[in-house]
Amino acid sequence: MYIVTTSFCKIQLQMFTIVSDAAETIKKLFVVFNDLVDIANLSFTNEGLSVQSMDTSHVSLVNLKIGKSYFKDYSIAQEATVGIKISNFVRILDCVGNDEITISFTYDNPDELIVKSEYSDFKMKTIDIETEEMEIPEMDIDVLIDADSNIIQKYLKNMAGFGDTVKIYTQDDVVHMKTAGEIGEVDLQIHDQRVEIKGRLTCEFATRYLMTFAKAAGISKRVVIKLLDDQPGIFEYVFDAESDSKISFFLAPKVKDDGDDEEY
């Protein structure tokens, strides 16, 4: 009787345990997160892991969804939300390397997230973050671009040397990306990619944010860009379609104030 009771209690103390054999991808995802936000809640649910956070300027929102089937093992005794400092998590993932990793959280140590690899054990302090996950509604779009993520990243790298604002606009059934600065300007046509134009579009975004989003090209071969005049742009990278796992970025467009200076 004593042995049965002890075993039962041990099971109950484990809130969740997940195992991933794709540590490199997990690290790349959180490296991109780290470029935008400092802290975030990890939400472990019966459907999978989700992470959502907004940058301190409230200009961009990052939304990560990893379906449970993406993991080698995904065991949830109770759904939980754990707040972490992203840079600390990335530091641990750097130490783990590309090995299989196990992430767990227990009732008796609610202030620690446990990360294990074959030869290393880490305990990371958790933090309390008072925020609720936002529901993101479906929206109409003027332009949809389904493109090779490396091509889009190349476009943005070329444009980053010219200006700090990228203008995306439609003209004669073609989508253009344009920027200008002290040394001149560049206007690129998006070609040889799947493009759907449903309405006229002119919007401007900060180059530095787009460059950060484009780092997700190391995770997904494709990027889907959804644009609507005067609305946040959506940049979506699906890295595992079978489990519906993806990282999405939402970016507020730049607007003109009365003095014709660009601002958010």
Swiss-Prot record:
> Is Metal-binding one of the keywords?
no
Keywords assigned:
DNA replication, DNA-binding
UniProt-listed InterPro entries? DNA_clamp_sf, Pr_cel_nuc_antig, Pr_cel_nuc_antig_C, Pr_cel_nuc_antig_CS, Pr_cel_nuc_antig_N
Do you know which CDD domains this protein is assigned to? PCNA (cd00577)
DNA-binding region ranges: 75-94
**What function does this protein fulfil?**
Sliding clamp subunit. Responsible for tethering the catalytic subunit of DNA polymerase to DNA during high-speed replication.
Kindly provide the name given to this protein in its UniProt entry.
Probable DNA polymerase sliding clamp 2
The processes (GO biological process) annotated in the record are: leading strand elongation; mismatch repair; regulation of DNA replication; translesion synthesis
Concerning SUPFAM superfamilies, the annotation shows: DNA clamp
GO MF term set = DNA binding; DNA polymerase processivity factor activity
Q: Which organism is it from?
A: Paramecium bursaria Chlorella virus 1 (PBCV-1)
The organism's place on the tree of life at top rank = Viruses
